[in-house]
């Protein structure tokens, strides 16, 4: 039997910031510096925390530490998640596919099919059961498919590299204060943490769909959009409204109000019309 010397594509993954490489808040720069100086894959928390089954919440026995390949992937992934972290909402504003690409964890088969298994298994089989992140997968009733996972970083995640929950909360308050100062200077009312989280959720959904689009996903969305747009406009808008009501919480709907909800319906409707007529961007 032939034994492979290496069963992974990239034994030394590292995080490469996206081309736009926007300036990050000082807290994120500080956290990334800490995470690069400390071996997060061999942190004491990885040995003392009890891994849990995400579906039922019961502890699961662990018999060994992270193997070196997964440890290398985790070191890169932690930096990527921090780079895309939204302080106000605790969300990672990037899809698993984008994180995988930027960490060099994605592979391409001879047939041209992309695989992000190494990154997704790291998150699903280790980081989430350990309590470092939480993931939420939402069914998009408008387009008829699953939206990319919404990844939230927990206080335990920051403890991997010695950033306390208090320091995180101070950064969140400072960030919200900066946002409100900017809004007030433009004549708008200040927002709460709930408002900031809702805005971040909307922005993330839009950005992730723009990034992860593939031919298969594109044409599937296009078919669903065409089906919806082919309906009477009033019926199409009612379908979108029901989907939006299901997407937002009661608190978020209260904050939006009738006018805000109507605006979201208009945005979604014209977005679907655009999808229905667009062609796949080959270049």
From Swiss-Prot:
<protein>
    <recommendedName>
        <fullName>Probable replication-associated protein repA1</fullName>
    </recommendedName>
</protein>
<dbReference type="Pfam" id="PF02387">
    <property type="entry name" value="IncFII_repA"/>
</dbReference>
<keyword id="KW-0614">Plasmid</keyword>
<keyword id="KW-0615">Plasmid copy control</keyword>
<keyword id="KW-0235">DNA replication</keyword>
<dbReference type="GO" id="GO:0006260">
    <property type="term" value="P:DNA replication"/>
</dbReference>
<comment type="function">
    <text>This protein is essential for plasmid replication; it is involved in copy control functions.</text>
</comment>
<dbReference type="GO" id="GO:0006276">
    <property type="term" value="P:plasmid maintenance"/>
</dbReference>
<comment type="similarity">
    <text>Belongs to the IncFII RepA family.</text>
</comment>
<dbReference type="InterPro" id="IPR003446">
    <property type="entry name" value="Plasmid_replication_init_RepA"/>
</dbReference>
């Amino acid at each position: 039997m032939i034994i492979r010397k290496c069963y992974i594509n990239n034994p030394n993954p590292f995080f490469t910031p996206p081309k736009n490489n926007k300036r990050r808040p000082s807290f994120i720069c500080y956290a990334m510096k800490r995470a690069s100086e400390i071996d997060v894959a061999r942190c004491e928390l990885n040995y003392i925390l009890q891994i849990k089954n995400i579906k039922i919440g019961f502890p699961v026995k662990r018999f060994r530490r992270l193997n070196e390949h997964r440890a290398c992937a985790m070191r890169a992934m932690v930096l990527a998640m921090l780079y895309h972290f939204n302080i106000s909402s605790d969300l990672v504003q990037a899809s698993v596919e984008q994180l995988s690409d930027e960490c060099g964890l994605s592979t391409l088969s001879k047939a041209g099919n992309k695989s992000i298994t190494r990154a997704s298994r790291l998150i699903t089989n280790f980081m989430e059961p350990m309590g470092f992140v939480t993931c939420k997968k939402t069914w998009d009733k408008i387009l008829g498919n699953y939206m990319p996972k919404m990844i939230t970083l927990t206080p335990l995640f920051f403890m991997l590299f010695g950033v306390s929950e208090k320091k995180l909360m101070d950064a969140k308050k400072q960030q919200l204060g900066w946002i409100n100062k900017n809004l007030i200077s433009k004549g708008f009312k200040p927002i709460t943490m709930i408002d900031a989280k809702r805005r971040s959720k909307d922005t993330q959904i839009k950005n992730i769909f723009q990034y992860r689009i593939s031919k298969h996903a594109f044409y599937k969305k296009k078919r669903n959009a065409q089906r919806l747009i082919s309906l009477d406009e009033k019926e199409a808008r009612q379908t979108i409204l029901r989907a939006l009501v299901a997407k937002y919480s009661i608190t978020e709907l209260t904050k939006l109000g009738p006018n805000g909800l109507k605006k979201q319906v208009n945005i979604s409707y014209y977005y679907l019309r655009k999808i229905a007529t667009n062609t796949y961007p080959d270049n």
